[in-house]
């Protein structure tokens, strides 16, 4: 199985986590999984989003790699240069492929490059994905949004996410020397994550922000009473999740939010808006605290039983993620 992606380590985000964990499960099951990633090419940082590196000199090298690997199935995970060239090679050589939709880049463009018409991005995304045999999307809510921008509903498959990886399986609590309750945010510190909505909430206790990004310096200066810890990973991150009272997820642009399932695996209740991603995760559950008012959502979450979070988290596994992925690939032999 070949996965072509513009997002992979050392990037830290939900796309990378999904592709890596899916591959790990498939490898354990005896499948051979290969990746075409940016580390195989010359790259430069994406303007206004430096963590993402744009690959150059990808054609005809992507085609040569596909030819050399001779995969039984090809999955194109991103719409960047690597994904675009892998798609082009497949179409040119009449090879079947699947794609997945991880990021609403049309919405990101509106935030970062408002001069570019959103319709252009929507048209590009629809054209990119509609040539695939199947399109894996994060949630049912996202499927409905993507129908509106022209993506073929008949090809879309809901592809859920896990959260039960590494240190998140059994996190160790630590003593955080801050006034309770402790409200934690984990993720990229950038405009599309809507962190300001969390920082402006009038909440008793302590707000902790974990992550890095272009808005970090500005927000630290603007909110000096809040605690900014920078980036943390693996056991240290899981311990901060487990030792906080509520995880606040203010994003309105994420297509799922793996940090949500990671928090639940640590027994930490979640406050969020009722938008695609959180809405799909919590629908019908007794730990659903979503509200259009983030402060109200946070106060509801504070009353949630942590054991209920741990129990609910069991339904989100990478084994299920890998199963859906494998069941929907399109073999070329």
Please state what every model-predicted region is:
Residues 217-236:
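Nucleotide-activated donor-binding/catalytic signature segment of Leloir-type glycosyltransferases, i.e.
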Residues 39, 141, 161-162:
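Carbohydrate-associated surface elements
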Residues 252:
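Aromatic "clamp/platform" in nucleotide-sugar-dependent glycosyltransferases that forms part
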Residues 265, 269-272:
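Short hydrophobic beta-strand element within catalytic cores of glycosyltransferases
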Residues 302-331:
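A charged, aromatic-enriched C-terminal amphipathic alpha-helix characteristic of glycosyltransferases
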Residues 147, 163-179:
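Acidic anion/phosphate-binding donor-loop and adjacent secondary structure
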Residues 129, 231-232, 239-244, 325:
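Short alpha-helical donor nucleotide-sugar binding micro-motif in glycosyltransferases
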Residues 175-208:
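Conserved donor-binding/catalytic core segment of Leloir-type glycosyltransferases
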């Amino acid at each position: 199985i070949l996965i072509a992606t513009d997002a992979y380590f050392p990037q830290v985000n939900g796309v990378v986590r999904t592709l890596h964990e899916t591959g790990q499960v498939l490898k354990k099951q005896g499948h051979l999984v290969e990746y075409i990633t940016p580390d195989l090419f010359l790259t430069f940082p994406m303007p206004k989003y430096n963590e993402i590196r744009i690959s150059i000199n990808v054609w005809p090298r992507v085609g040569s790699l596909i030819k050399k690997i001779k995969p039984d199935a090809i999955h194109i995970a991103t719409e960047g240069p690597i994904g675009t060239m892998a798609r082009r090679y497949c179409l040119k050589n009449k090879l079947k492929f699947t794609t997945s939709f991880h990021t609403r880049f049309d919405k990101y463009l509106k935030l970062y490059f408002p001069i570019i018409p959103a319709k252009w991005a929507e048209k590009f995304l629809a054209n990119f994905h509609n040539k695939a045999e199947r399109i894996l999307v994060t949630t049912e809510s996202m499927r409905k949004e993507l129908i509106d921008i022209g993506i073929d509903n008949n090809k879309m498959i809901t592809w859920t996410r896990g959260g039960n990886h590494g240190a998140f399986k059994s996190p160790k609590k630590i003593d955080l020397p801050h006034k309770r309750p402790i409200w934690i945010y984990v993720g990229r510190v950038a405009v599309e994550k809507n962190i300001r909505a969390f920082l402006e909430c009038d909440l008793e206790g302590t707000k902790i922000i974990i992550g890095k990004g272009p808005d970090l310096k500005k927000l630290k200066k603007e909110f000096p009473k809040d605690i900014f810890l920078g980036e943390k990973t693996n056991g240290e991150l899981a311990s901060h999740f487990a030792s906080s009272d509520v995880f606040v997820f203010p994003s309105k642009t994420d297509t799922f939010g793996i940090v949500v399932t990671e928090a639940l695996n640590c027994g930490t209740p979640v406050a969020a808006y009722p938008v695609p991603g959180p809405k799909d995760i919590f629908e019908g559950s007794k730990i659903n605290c979503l509200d259009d008012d983030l402060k109200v959502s946070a106060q509801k979450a504070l009353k949630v039983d942590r054991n209920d979070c741990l129990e609910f988290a069991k339904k989100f596994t990478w084994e299920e993620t890998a199963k859906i992925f494998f069941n929907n690939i399109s073999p070329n032999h």
